[in-house]
Amino acid sequence: MSIIIFLSLICMPLIDFLIRSEINPHLEPVPFLVVLGNVQDGGSPHIGCAKSCCAVLWEHPDPQRKVTCLGLVDPVNEQSFIFEATPDFPEQLKALRMFAPFQKDGIPNGIFLTHAHIGHYSGLMYLGKEAFNSHQTKVFVMPKMQFFLEKNGPWNQLINEENIKIQPLTNQVHH
């Protein structure tokens, strides 16, 4: 059932767009989502798991199983964004580049972090000086996540060294 939902919500609109683009190259491109991962925060196989669901994966890892992450691509404005900076961040950025070849330096225009579970922010480590050494990569966060990143290492080092630039979000309800 979940594969049907995945195909109908993500793959089919993208495939439809690609097919129609071939038929009519003047078709206006539209923003779209790309599923870059759908596995729980701890990865796959899950650390310490000895159940049958993980046993095969310990022996034969599946390189397609990545921690939950979405890419948003806007081909009109040549922008891309990623939702969650997971432990699989480098591979997910590479996958996103396939859909957004216009990405400057391979880093999207922004990263949205939804909450402070380890699988949603730990990939920020790859933006530091020991790895990519990015410069002011925009990271969109709610106030609690902003406080967490600013007050805790090594994440505050990314802010202090200007590897990332926090973009505060607020929860506003419009009536």
Question: What does each of the following model-derived ranges do?
Answer:
Residues S8-I10, L14-H175:
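Binuclear metal-dependent hydrolase catalytic cores
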Residues M1-I4:
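N-terminal Sec-pathway targeting helices
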